[in-house]
Amino acid sequence: DEVLTSLLNLCTPLEPFDMPLLDAHGATLSEDIYAGERLVMKSGSRIRSTQIGLAASIGLDHLPTRPHPRVVVISAGPDLVEPGLNLTGDEEYETNSWLLTTAVRETGAVAYRVHSIPENEDQLKDAIEDQLVRADLVIISGERHDDSFDLITRTLKQLGEITEVEIAIDSSGRHNFGTIGPDKVPVVTLPGDPIAAYISFELLVRPMIRTMLGASTIHRPSVKARLEKGLSSTSGVRSYIRGVLSEDGKSVTPLGSQDEQATLSDANAFIAVPEGDADVAAGAEVTVVVLERRYI
């Protein structure tokens, strides 16, 4: 919670401006909209097709919006290889920039994936500095085994003020955050492991982007559900177990093989297990973070 608070302190809603109706689709409304004296759209809501139609029906051709934040996503490390190429030795396919770029877009921001993979400090510094002109937020991650985390941290400390943090989440990996460049652009380093990176994105980075959007809610919705199958987690830290929430939202089933990346694509929810609950029995009521809105 302290880390999230620090991250949110780096973010402020972007300055609003009027956008043509079609361009406003997917943005966040920055003012209440009235038809005469009747409130028809609330500030902070996401502008969807139905809001576009409503605006047109009351004679509006523009809407006051918060712009989409521009988020730059970079992966760095000498062992990373682009998908489609052959692997040798200790190399691994670069996964996180693809995962995180699309996750950023799903959150409502504009995402820029840096196509080159920096292998040393000079290359990474050049890549970051080249991107700052179009960045409201920078996300960086490294290799699955996190050996490149030190490379990333050293480079970022040349560019700004960086804080390294440990997060009390099971298998969370290494993180840092801060501001870089003359405009003090927020930056977050996520773990190299794709599962850990995605969980951290959902819990930490998504709320940052939603704050920049000026959204009325910055967190995923959560519900209480009955656990269909017992589970075990690491005592002393929070765990977010990938699971499948039932269509009616009343029960949730944890997926097997939690160390496999396939659980990310198979899950529609995280089962949030508090620090003190190492084992949770079937039938217990648990808190479920809903990842797909159609399930609530």
Predicted feature residues:
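Helix-rich terminal scaffold detector
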Residues: 1, 65-190, 194-199
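Flexible glycine/proline-rich
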Residues: 17, 21-22, 26, 31, ...
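Short, glycine/charged-enriched hinge/interface segments at domain edges or termini
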Residues: 1-118, 254, 270, 287-296
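A generic local secondary-structure boundary/capping motif
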Residues: 36, 43, 59-65, 128-129, ...
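Structured N-terminal alpha/beta-domain signature
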Residues: 31-38, 74, 142-143, 147, ...
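Short, conserved clusters of charged catalytic residues that mark active-site
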Residues: 50, 123, 222
